[in-house]
Regions:
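Well-ordered, non-membrane alpha-helical segments in soluble/globular domains
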Residues: 19-30
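Short acidic, S/G/P-rich loop/turn micro-motifs used as interaction or catalytic elements
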Residues: 12-21, 49-53, 76-77
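N-terminal chloroplast transit peptides
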Residues: 1-2
């Protein structure tokens, strides 16, 4: 099994979807990836299941139940998003592991 390092930002769904121009930001990023022929390396996850890990017990106490995450293998992209969006939490994890079996899992 190949273990990958993932980076993420997470915030309330209300904040990222309604209050911030997230759609525009992601659309521009996808366009940039197409122009540079780079493979998409980020995912938008509603109610990400990796947050159910014991690793994030303290973080989930600070988040609303209805949160959303952007997960990527690109640390620079996540750092850029943090600077662009401000009111988000940032973190990283390895997956798949025993604690996080489905790194890109989510609930609807």
């Amino acid at each position: 099994m190949v273990v990958t390092k993932y980076y993420f930002i997470v915030a309330s769904n209300q904040f990222l979807i309604t209050e911030e121009p997230l759609e525009e930001v992601l659309r521009e990023r996808i366009q940039y990836y197409r122009i540079t022929k780079k493979r998409i390396d980020f995912w938008l996850l509603p109610k990400p299941t990796f947050l159910q890990s014991k690793l994030y017990k303290d973080l989930t106490k600070q988040l609303p139940e209805n949160c959303i995450a952007i997960v990527s293998t690109n640390k620079i992209f996540i750092t850029w998003l943090k600077l662009r969006l401000n009111n988000v939490f940032i973190g990283k994890f390895l997956g798949p592991t025993e604690q996080i079996q489905n790194p890109l899992g989510f609930e609807l």
